[in-house]
Amino acid sequence: MPSGFNAKSFLKNVTSAPGVYRMYDKHQQVIYVGKAKDLKKRLSSYFRVNIANVKTQALVSHIDHIDVTVTHSETDALLLENDYIKQYMPKYNVLLRDDKSYPYILLSGHKHPRLAYHRGPKREKGHYFGPYPNGGAVRESLHLIQKLFPIRQCDDLYYKSRSRPCLQYQLDRCSAPCVGIVSDDEYSEQVKLAGLFLRGKDKQVISQLVAKMETAAIDMEYERAAQYRDQITALRRVAEQQEVSNHKGDMDVIGVDYASGIACFHLLFIRDGKIFGSRSYYPSVPAETEIEEVLSSFLGQFYLNADIQRTIPKEVILSHHFDGITELQASIEHALDKKFELKTQVRGDRANFLRLAMTNASNAVATKLSHKNTVEQRFQLLEEALELNEPIKRMECFDISHTMGESTVASCVVFNREGPHKADYRRYNITGITGGDDYAAMEQAISRRFDKIDNNGKVPDLVFIDGGIGQLRVAQTIVDEKCVNIDHPPLLICVTKGEGRKAGLETFTVGGSEQTFEVASDSPAFHLMLHIRDESHRFAITGHRNKRQKTRNTSTLESIAGVGPKRRKALLQHLGGIQEVKGASVAELTKVPGISLEMAQTIHDALRGG
């Protein structure tokens, strides 16, 4: 324990009321947040003579001072603890790292509602279906629904500017309410059916469609009856693919596996008896943390997340029991003001779902451990190859991508000892340089990256430059200038492609000394350096292609006199893209708001070379 902190004196003044405590280190950083029913009793436990837990020993050794906040109840303490953990992200707390809001499908409240991907606050009027486990699940569902129900998915501006059906109508994926091809009643009918389908009422949807098909057949509307028949067939095919149980309610099923410092919470979202989706969480767990704390911390943070409170089911099945589960359940139930039950002893369908969740969690941890061991070995061998005295915690790699100097983009990718850390990836749009000047592009990218760096920031141990010695020199000059007050400035290494740009013939040069070094091409250290180089190249070229395409979509129109930003936007949105604009007749161009006959002729001639 640091001599600057007097635990005995501190504990004399601590109350026995419920509350939250924040532990700070000498740098005034919050390193741990905890809650207690009895603050004095809980805080005293940290300063006993014999502390067996290694994590607690490490925590106590770094305490500089402790702040205490008294609350009215244990529930209030739980809520405040959750807020503080999200605010400070303390290093000794179990942290739910993926705290993004869940994605939903929005069925808007317009006269002709649209289906859309939604993430974030629910401000727009309409019905929200979800939550879905990830964005991919939403997009997959939207793609499926588009095949089953011809409801628009375009944005409102595009919808309002249409004068003719778009491609989605030709593909039978939209009934074109924008131009009145479908009646309001027919469109509303499909919207209601889509809503029922999204609520999991497949049988009800099919039943209604069967009735409509039979009515259409009786009325000798055979084409309409055939449309209903095809819709029913597609729906039945989808329904057969979904796993269904005899349990018809909503619940979350959580399988937990914890080994070698890696914890996985695999969640199955059961809605109306079906597996609606699944998602794995890997909370950041400090070394030597007990499983009870991992469970309690995760559940508290997860179910008190404001983004998902309104969609929490009443029943949550958990693979592990732990001390304090009853109190945690009561606190969450009180905080949410709704019935909430944590169960660990289940049978039948619930047990089957739980076994599935546990299997997925176990497999996920095994995969993570295997990957972690492989990455760790690569880092250790790279440290040996570079003869480093300190372990590598963070590596970055920069690359430049352009086409003949057009749409230049720089990338910065980040690796830590778990592999690629994509949350820290960055792209830089390079401006104000001569096209094709890779040195100036690298200078701008490195300058922007290191502009605000300090000892408390994310200082890389290694920086790789994908390029030649000239780019390395530019980067080294900038780093020397920007990192003058940094205790341990990064080591720069450039990766230069070999003869014929063949993989395995790369050369590596150290910044400053400009000495080259060799690593066997079959060495894991070599593979690690090429991995980060290739990832940087991939990230740069993807950004460059996106920027180039966006530029080319507008640059053709930019060259036409009289076509400013507003007219370009109107043309692209009204007609659906640059190719459609190029293929439009003069008459079609005049239907775009703001385009006169004379302007339409000018645009037509410019794009057709006439």
UniProtKB/Swiss-Prot annotation:
The keyword Nucleotide-binding does not apply. GO terms for molecular function: DNA binding; excinuclease ABC activity. Residues 203-238 form the UVR domain. Its main location: cytoplasm. CDD domains: GIY-YIG_UvrC_Cho (cd10434). The UvrABC repair system catalyzes the recognition and processing of DNA lesions. UvrC both incises the 5' and 3' sides of the lesion. The N-terminal half is responsible for the 3' incision and the C-terminal half is responsible for the 5' incision. Interacts with UvrB in an incision complex. Belongs to the UvrC family. This is UvrABC system protein C.
